[in-house]
């Protein structure tokens, strides 16, 4: 018995998670069948093989593997006359696996997670550990332009729900030896893969350390909702502050530009959006179309977006404030006052239309394309003549709120759009309560929220305004011509 035990330890050194020795092959296979759910999960396949006269078993998830490639590998294994001279699983991989990436995996739990991630696991009688083949091929949609970030010129591709394809889209654009695509697996039940993409030597090392630390100690059962779940887990906890701490993009060209500027792009498997870090409020004014037009036109578009952002936040509160204080209006501005008689208070009308617009947005997301025309007609009737004739709304409210609703789409970030919306509604309520003092209080609260917003790491939410950086600020305020220094 002692001799047998010594011989077994010489051929298969002890590693955690596996049964050892030839006599334990059936126990090892049975345990892996149990862990992988063979017989209970219709998509999990277990297959018995004979490799060089030895028992072997292979596990793979149907729909994950490249079947032609896997069949060629298996056919080559089964044609082997013997495995004389092969010392362990790592030696087997070096000698007899050339069609795809393969590695010996001594840890059982890691091997099982690999199968769930699309890899193929094989165990061979007499070898410690298992052979893990990377022959996966995930089902995915084709690369196409995102619906929400279209451009008139430039590339018309977008990220998909496959991490490897998204990484390839970045690598295709950045052919630089300093580009790093660092892959991490989150420590939660779903084992989601995440990639940190950055330029070595240019990205903030403090940001990278903070990201790795937070991602590898993330306390979640799963990342079912993908990038938003991760964003909430890594961002500072300020649930009361509506201003976004993370930017998103579905465009590889935007992500590439951020990487080249020293930012960090976080790709999440099963997500077609990338996270852009660090985030400052002035970065939300940038838009990809600015850089597909000449500098003068790009600068004009940036100015327009800045004005629209300010108008969407302040136009209805200022109008409501002036209507409440008609004596402050010059005679030439009296047309701003409400001309028709109304029964519903203006504050109720304004807040009601704010809510109705959001209801229509939510409904439009769930409306089939076939019914979209009918939905548009119904929405126009609700916020059109019927509402005015029924004395629910006055025409002035509809005009200003229609402008706000349309102008809000000039902001490409949904999160920033809703942050300005919440601040606008807060201003309306404070003006209703305290008039001019309420307006002043609303401005102070809004500025306080912006100043106290905490990015994950970096120089602050108001950078490059505070701390002041003239070159960075100038770049964000207007579109500079491309030169050797700033290209």
Q: Model-found features: residue ranges?
A:
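Short glycine-/small-residue-rich flexible loop motifs, especially phosphate/cofactor-binding loops
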Residues: 33, 171, 256, 357, ...
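Hydrophobic alpha-helical transmembrane segments of membrane transport and translocation systems
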Residues: 395-397, 401-487
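Transmembrane alpha-helical segments that form the functional core of multipass membrane systems
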Residues: 266, 273, 279-412, 416-427
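Long alpha-helical, hydrophobic tracts
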Residues: 142, 155-158, 175-178, 182, ...
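Membrane-embedded alpha-helical signal segments
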Residues: 1-318, 322, 326-331, 335-337, ...
């Amino acid at each position: 018995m002692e001799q047998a035990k010594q011989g077994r330890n010489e051929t298969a050194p002890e590693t955690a998670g596996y049964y050892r020795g030839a006599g334990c092959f059936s126990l090892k296979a049975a345990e892996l069948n149990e862990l992988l759910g063979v017989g209970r999960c219709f998509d999990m396949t277990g297959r018995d093989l004979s490799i060089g006269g030895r028992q072997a078993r292979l596990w793979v998830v149907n729909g994950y593997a490249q079947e032609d490639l896997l069949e060629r590998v298996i056919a080559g294994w089964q044609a082997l006359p013997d495995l004389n001279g092969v010392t362990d699983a790592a030696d087997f991989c070096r000698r007899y696996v050339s069609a795809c990436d393969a590695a010996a995996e001594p840890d059982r739990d890691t091997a099982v997670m690999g199968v769930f991630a699309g890899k193929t696991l094989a165990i061979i009688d007499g070898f410690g550990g298992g052979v893990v083949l990377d022959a996966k091929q995930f089902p995915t949609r084709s690369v196409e332009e995102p619906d929400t970030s279209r451009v008139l010129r430039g590339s018309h591709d977008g990220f998909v729900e496959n991490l490897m394809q998204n990484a390839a889209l970045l690598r295709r654009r950045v052919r630089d030896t300093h580009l790093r695509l660092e892959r991490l697996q989150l420590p939660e039940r779903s084992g989601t893969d995440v990639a940190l993409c950055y330029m070595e030597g240019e990205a903030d090392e403090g940001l990278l350390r903070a990201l790795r630390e937070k991602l590898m100690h993330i306390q979640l059962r799963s990342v079912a909702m993908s990038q938003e779940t991760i964003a909430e887990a890594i961002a500072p906890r300020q649930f009361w502050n509506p201003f976004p701490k993370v930017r998103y993009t579905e465009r590889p060209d935007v992500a590439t530009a951020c990487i080249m500027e020293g930012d960090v792009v976080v790709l999440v498997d099963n997500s077609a959006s990338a996270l852009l870090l660090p985030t400052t409020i002035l970065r939300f004014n940038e838009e990809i179309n600015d850089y597909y037009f000449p500098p003068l036109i790009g600068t004009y578009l940036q100015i327009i977006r800045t004005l629209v952002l300010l108008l969407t936040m302040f136009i209805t509160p200022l109008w409501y404030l002036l209507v409440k204080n008609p004596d402050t209006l010059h005679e030439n501005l009296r047309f701003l006052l409400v001309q028709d008689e109304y029964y519903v208070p203006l504050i109720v009308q304004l807040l009601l239309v704010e809510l109705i617009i959001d209801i229509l947005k939510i409904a439009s997301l769930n409306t089939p394309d076939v019914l979209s025309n009918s939905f548009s007609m119904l929405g126009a009737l609700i916020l059109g003549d019927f509402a005015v004739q029924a004395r629910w709304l006055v025409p002035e409210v509809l005009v200003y709120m229609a402008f706000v609703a349309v102008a809000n789409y000039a902001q490409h970030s949904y999160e920033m759009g809703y942050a300005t919306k919440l601040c606008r509604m807060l201003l309306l309520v404070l003006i209703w309560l305290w008039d001019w003092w309420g307006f002043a209080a609303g401005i102070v609260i809004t500025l306080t929220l912006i100043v106290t917003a905490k990015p994950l790491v970096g120089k602050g939410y108001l950078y490059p305004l505070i701390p002041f950086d003239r070159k960075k600020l100038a770049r964000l305020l207007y579109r500079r011509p491309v030169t050797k220094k700033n290209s």
